[in-house]
From Swiss-Prot:
One of its GO terms (biological process) is NAD biosynthetic process. This is Probable nicotinate-nucleotide adenylyltransferase. It comes from Dinoroseobacter shibae (strain DSM 16493 / NCIMB 14021 / DFL 12). GO terms for molecular function: ATP binding; nicotinate-nucleotide adenylyltransferase activity. The gene is nadD. The keyword ATP-binding applies. Its EC number is 2.7.7.18.
Length: 195
């Protein structure tokens, strides 16, 4: 493990919340706290991506997004990192595989909103992600039906588990939890010029 990389010990469970965080906002904080409480995680790492292959416009500079995320998310069990840039990975499947190599003995859980589950089947090697690590899905009101009808949810319907044991589950495994609404999005914040 390199200097400056987040710490995690053998046997610990780390939730991975990836995104551009352009900008990070209270909705990210909210789902992070929910994930810590509901999925049996020791840590959550915000993986601030160098770029998002599914978005047409480049994000703000990585260092700025990481600094602003750290200023917003102050929790003793949360780490903000730009580790994907150091790993040289572009896609989530590569990032997860790289983290598993760099942190043997650490269990990882991929975290996502239900809006991402609804289009997860469009991600590069999404089925490899499901095969490598459990996936924790957090749904705001109104997102449940579309997400549960999504191709990924249908294909892995038999791998759905209860939320509390997700951190100890063998992949493929996923859990779906409803969370109270915090109506914020990075796109809307950028459009208003608040970023």
């Amino acid at each position: 493990m390199r200097s400056g990389w987040p710490m995690a010990g053998t046997g610990q469970t780390v939730g991975l919340l990836g995104g551009s965080f352009d900008p990070a906002h209270g909705g990210h904080v909210h789902i992070t706290r929910q994930a810590l409480a509901r999925f049996g995680l020791d840590w959550v790492w915000w993986l601030v991506s160098p770029g998002n292959p599914l978005k047409p416009n480049p994000p703000a500079p990585l260092a700025l997004r990481c600094a602003r995320a750290r200023a917003l998310m102050r929790h003793p069990r949360v780490r903000i990192t730009g580790i994907e840039a150091e790993l040289g990975t572009r896609y989530t499947a590569e990032t997860v595989a790289g983290l598993r190599r760099c942190y043997p003995g650490v269990r990882f859980v991929w975290l996502m909103g239900a809006d991402n589950l609804a289009q997860f089947h469009r991600w590069d090697r999404w089925d490899e992600i499901m095969a490598q690590v459990p996936v924790g899905v957090l749904a705001r009101p109104g997102q449940r039906l579309a997400a549960l009808r999504a191709p990924a949810a249908q294909r892995f319907a038999g791998a759905r588990r209860g939320a509390a044991g997700l951190g100890r589950a063998q992949a493929p495994a996923w859990a779906f939890v409803n969370v109270p609404l915090v109506d914020l999005s990075s796109s809307e914040i950028r459009a208003r010029g608040d970023w």
